[in-house]
Curated annotation (Swiss-Prot):
It comes from Nocardioides sp. (strain ATCC BAA-499 / JS614). Gene3D superfamilies: Nucleic acid-binding proteins. Coiled coil: none annotated. This is Translation initiation factor IF-1. Its main location: cytoplasm. SUPFAM superfamilies: Nucleic acid-binding proteins. Signal peptide: none annotated.
Length: 73
């Protein structure tokens, strides 16, 4: 799959699960962001729990919100 241009991918750990499939994620650099699950992960019923290691995509326009695109096994 080709990489998207202009997005920042960074690893993090899920700190808490919020309503509506939103999660608070602490990034590897110490920042905390609000993230939602990507559509493909929703389609395939991939569960995300607190303490899971994930990859988050951030937009350069708003670095406080992101999209969870991968959960490490």
């Amino acid at each position: 799959m080709p990489k998207k241009e202009g997005v920042i991918e960074i690893e993090g750990t899920v700190v808490e699960a919020l309503p509506n499939a939103m999660f608070r994620v602490e990034l590897s650099n110490g920042h905390k962001v609000l993230a939602h699950i990507s559509g493909k992960m929703r389609q395939h019923y991939i569960r995300i729990l607190p303490e899971d290691r994930v990859v988050v995509e951030l937009s350069p326009y708003d670095l406080t919100r992101g999209r969870i695109v991968y959960r490490y096994k």
